[in-house]
Structure formats: C-alpha cells, structure tokens
A protein has these predicted regions:
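Short beta-strand elements that form the blades of beta-propeller/WD-repeat-like
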Residues: 1, 11-12, 17-27, 82-86, ...
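Aromatic (tryptophan-biased) beta-strands that constitute blades/sheets of beta-rich domains
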Residues: 2-5, 40-69, 101-109, 151-155, ...
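Repeated scaffold domains used in trafficking and secretory/extracellular systems
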Residues: 4-18, 62-63, 68-77, 112-125, ...
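A broadly used, surface-exposed interaction patch
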Residues: 6-56
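A short local loop/turn or secondary-structure capping micro-motif enriched for an aromatic residue
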Residues: 10, 29-30, 93-94, 103, ...
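Structural motif
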Residues: 27-43, 90-95, 137-143, 178-184, ...
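Solenoidal tandem-repeat scaffolds enriched in leucines and small polar residues
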Residues: 53-144
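Eukaryotic tandem repeat interaction scaffolds
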Residues: 119-123, 127-212
Length: 248
C-alpha cells in the first residue's frame, strides 16, 4: 500500500473529480492539505524519519498541489469546485480547486462567559449556496459560499460541545461529545436524545435519521439495536440499508 505522506488523514472530501485531504502529525506539530487525482495510482512519499529532518519542505507525493498549513485543520467540506475549511485558532477559509483563496473570515466570537474552546469550529455544513459554520459551543453562522458574506447567525440554545453535524438540506443532526444528539430545524430543536456515544455516521432516509453510534444502530424517533463490532458507515443497496462495520 502506498502512503503519499507518513501521517494520518484527518479529513477528506471530493472536489472537482479529485480527492482533497488533510494530514496531521501532532508530535511534529505539522499539517498538510493536498489534492490527489482519483485517476492516478497513489505514490509513496517520504518516510517518518525523512519528515523529521525536512518537516517544513516535505510535501504529499503525487499531489496536484500541496500546502503547508499554518495550524491544524478542524473542519473540511466542499461543493463543486470550492473547498471550505477551518484552521484551529485562525479562521475559516474558502479556496477553489486550484488552491486559490476566494475568501476568509475570523472565528465566531462568544459573548460573555463561555467554556474554554467553545468558539472553536466544531463542524461545517453546506446548504445550497450557503455555508453553515458551527462553533463547539453551539453558535452558528450562515455564510455566502460565493463571496464569504455573513448572512445571519444564531445558536443551538443548549450547552454542548459539538463534535459533528449532519444535514439533509435545512434539517440538521447535531452530535455533542457528551453523547447528546439534537435534530435542529427551522431554528429550533425538534428532538433531543442521549446516545451511548458520539455519532459515527447518519443519514436522513426521508422520514427519520438513521444513526450509527457506539456499538449501536439507532432510529432517532424509534428504537435501537446493539452490535458487537463498531459501525463505520451507512450504505443503501437495493433499497436495503446496511451498516459497514470496522471488520469490513
């Protein structure tokens, strides 16, 4: 197996027919973002030992473009030829598929007393031509994808530490690190439920949210089934929903 860069991939999205991913090494305090063609075979890049020596100049092997990130990427999404991401303690950025910067914004501000790190970006959602940026503390901003103009802002209205957000159009499913999950629609919480762990994957099937949590498959408005292996991803095949687990 080829490894273009000797670090774990933290985020990956499809953009303009290619893969855009981020690689992070916390020990060496470095991060990369690169675009890889889906038509070409992966190449093997530098080793971890070589990276320690040339940590500032080593790039992702075989990439169309690769950039040294000035801080750790904490969220990544894409739509068409645009890539939207957030960097820890820095801001929110939008680039095109050639890595040209289109716009940038500062992080969301928390008013008054708030828990530590609550203004950090917890997730990014895309709804039509708008970007919804969620802070870990539950604030959100709606931003124009085209020019980065802030259109509106709001709040989930509960104490939380947002870990991920799934959406089906304007219907959002918010997952908190303490196991709470909320369906959020039309600016208000419609369902709140405490799960055994954070949400690994979720898809709205047209009537309800199908959720994979810690060794548990859940219908948000219904029951749940426990499982031995860890669920990773929901897959629909021949009108049947299945769960891909960590055993393949």
């Amino acid at each position: 197996t080829a490894h273009p860069f000797p670090c774990e991939i933290s985020f990956a999205v499809l953009c303009d027919g290619a893969l855009v991913a981020t690689w992070v090494d916390h020990d060496l305090r470095l991060a990369r973002m690169a675009m890889l063609s889906l038509d070409d075979a992966l190449e093997t890049g530098v080793t971890k030992a070589e990276l320690r020596i040339s940590r500032g100049s080593s790039m992702v092997a075989g990439s169309k473009w690769c950039h040294v990130m000035e801080a750790e990427p904490v969220a990544l999404e894409s739509k068409d030829d645009k890539i939207i991401f957030a960097l820890w303690s820095r801001g929110i950025y939008c680039i095109d598929s050639s890595a040209n910067e289109l716009w940038r914004l500062p992080l969301l501000e928390e008013q008054g007393k708030s828990p530590p790190r609550s203004n950090e970006v917890g997730a990014i959602s895309i709804v039509d031509d708008e970007v919804v940026v969620w802070s870990r503390g539950g604030k959100y901003q709606r931003i124009s994808l085209a020019d980065g103009k802030v259109l509106s802002d709001g709040s989930l209205g509960v104490d939380c530490d947002i870990e991920s957000v799934f959406n089906d159009g304007e219907n959002f499913l918010v997952s908190s690190n303490d196991g709470w999950a909320w369906e959020f629609s039309d600016g208000q919480i419609t369902i709140a439920r405490r799960l055994r762990g954070t949400i690994q994957d979720a898809i709205h099937d047209g009537s309800d949210w199908r959720i994979i949590s810690w060794r548990e498959d859940i219908m948000l408005r219904g029951g749940s089934n426990t499982r031995v292996d860890l669920g990773v991803q929901l897959v629909k095949q021949d009108e049947t929903w299945m769960v891909l687990d960590n055993q393949g």
